[in-house]
């Protein structure tokens, strides 16, 4: 029987999480992509604490998605820019990137590149 896409994504995410670990000096930028929305969090895994977050559900960003929708690369880029600005305000400039088991393509790639352009280093 063929392995489902969900199972392969979960396996890939477990494999990535074994290698990617966020600290206070260099937290983890975790990305979760659903069919409609995209979420990004800057996480300190040692303290198990979310330092900054942004998503397409944020009230500040919600008005910008009225024409384009939330499941687009433009929306992902806005979320990436927003989470990078929030992290930089907290004094975080270097992170490790956790793509959440998804391929580095499309919305995940757009979010990562926008976060880099906004000043995060990874």
Swiss-Prot record:
Keyword set, alphabetical order: Ribonucleoprotein, Ribosomal protein, RNA-binding, rRNA-binding
The keyword Hydrolase is assigned to this record: no
Entry-linked Pfam families: Ribosomal_L18p (PF00861)
GO BP term (any one): translation
Any Gene Ontology CC annotation: cytosolic large ribosomal subunit
CDD domains referenced in this protein's UniProt entry, alphabetically: Ribosomal_L18_L5e
Organism superkingdom: Bacteria
Entry's Gene Ontology molecular function annotations: 5S rRNA binding; structural constituent of ribosome
Role this protein plays: This is one of the proteins that bind and probably mediate the attachment of the 5S RNA into the large ribosomal subunit, where it forms part of the central protuberance.
Quaternary context: Part of the 50S ribosomal subunit; part of the 5S rRNA/L5/L18/L25 subcomplex. Contacts the 5S and 23S rRNAs.
Similarity comment text for this entry: Belongs to the universal ribosomal protein uL18 family.
Name of the protein: Large ribosomal subunit protein uL18
Organism per entry: Synechococcus sp. (strain JA-2-3B'a(2-13))
Gene assigned in the entry: rplR
């Amino acid at each position: 029987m063929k392995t489902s896409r969900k199972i392969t994504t979960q396996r890939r995410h477990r494999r990535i999480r074994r290698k990617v670990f966020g600290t206070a000096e260099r937290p983890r930028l975790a990305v979760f992509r659903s069919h409609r929305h995209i979420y990004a969090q800057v996480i300190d895994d040692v303290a198990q604490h979310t330092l900054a977050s942004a998503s397409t559900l944020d009230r500040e960003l919600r008005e910008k998605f009225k024409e384009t929708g939330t499941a687009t690369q433009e929306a992902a880029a806005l979320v990436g820019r927003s989470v990078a600005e929030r992290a930089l305000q907290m004094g975080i400039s270097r992170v490790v990137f956790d793509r959440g088991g998804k391929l580095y393509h499309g919305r995940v790639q757009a979010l990562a590149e926008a976060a880099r352009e906004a000043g995060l280093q990874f």
